[in-house]
Amino acid sequence: MTIDDDLSRIAEQEKVLSFDAFDLTTAWQLGKLLQELATERGLGIAIDVTLHSMPVFYAALPGVTPDNVNWVRRKRNMVLRYFRSSYASGLKLQKDGKTVEDNGLSGADYAPHGGSFPINVKGSGCIGAVTVSGLPQRDDHNLAVEALALMLAKDLDTLRLA
């Protein structure tokens, strides 16, 4: 797939993977689902679910290092700044030949890499982010999308990046 193909598919993901309502219980369920998927697959990842600026779920599975904590923070910052997935932001920067620094942001605080996805609520927009770190960026992104698709009973095959 080309960058444009990926950006188009991610835009569709962000549109389709939207909740009617999302609260602290839903946040916990999303984080727990990701933890279960990762454990079943033996994935060493960090998982974070944040509403606005409030962390509501965090898990670090075997294999995670302190670096993953920082990656989570930096990827999440991309979503909370631009209200789109960190992977989409990174692909757009790559397509345009730009960096986060070109947008006046610090690379120490913003990571335009896959793994953080907006938590969107219909009629409200982005209210937070779900973030995965520990895999290659495309896999981090796909795992977050998979969990959201499962929670929302959406067809993952039509949403997943190839």
Swiss-Prot record:
Cited Pfam families: HbpS-like (PF03928)
InterPro entries linked to this entry: PduO/GlcC-like (IPR005624), PduO/GlcC-like_sf (IPR038084), YBR137W-like (IPR010371)
Entry superkingdom: Bacteria
Family membership noted in the UniProt record: Belongs to the UPF0303 family.
Protein name: UPF0303 protein RL3365
Species name: Rhizobium johnstonii (strain DSM 114642 / LMG 32736 / 3841)
